[in-house]
Amino acid sequence: DIYEIHKNKYDHNILLNDIQKLDKIQHKHSLVAIQFPDTSAEKKYLVYYDERWDCKLFLNYKTVDRADEESVINKVSADLNVDKSQINCRYISSKVQEKYSESHQENRIYNHRLYEIKIQVFPEDEQKENFVVNGRHYYWMSISDMERDPNIVKKNLDVIDFVKESMHA
């Protein structure tokens, strides 16, 4: 009845505000899978050591709502000192995952967008098993290498599984 409608002040504006708050809870990150240029061996991916997580992780960046692929290319180019014209980026998949954030010490909901990056000409120094660029330590690791690393398994197995399912389908 009319009395009940006026008593309950929850309307479409409040609903929209609640939806926007929920959206902010989600942490949007673009994951980057870069395969080692040598295709004869087991597939290896580029990971880096993240000090906040104390773990080797896939390259990742906060997702940009518009022009995310361009943003990913720009960031990979800057991080690895590779000319942007040498980088091809392809969207693979998305997945919403709840996981514990080592850096924030709490469970968080992540919306991961996975991109495959191909670099046409990889700098020779960056083809070594591990290397440092711009102060960041990088490693080439296969999925099975990652699955054998207890620290990666403990902190990031859900992301490893997501990449494995998406890239090896």
Residue ranges and their predicted role:
Residues D1, D18, E51-D65, E124-A169:
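Nudix hydrolase/Nudix homology domain
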Residues I2-H6:
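Alpha-helical transmembrane segments
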Residues N8-V47, V64:
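Conserved N-terminal beta-strand and adjoining loop/helix that marks the start
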Residues Q35, L114-Q120, W140-S142:
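Short, well-ordered beta-strand micro-motif
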Residues T39-D83:
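Conserved Nudix-box catalytic region and its N-terminal flanking loop in Nudix hydrolases
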Residues D83-V96:
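A short coil-to-beta-strand element that immediately follows conserved catalytic motifs
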Residues I87-N88, S101, M141:
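Polybasic, proline/glycine-rich intrinsically disordered low-complexity segments
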Residues V96-E129:
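Active-site-adjacent beta-strand/loop module that shapes the phosphate/pyrophosphate-binding cleft
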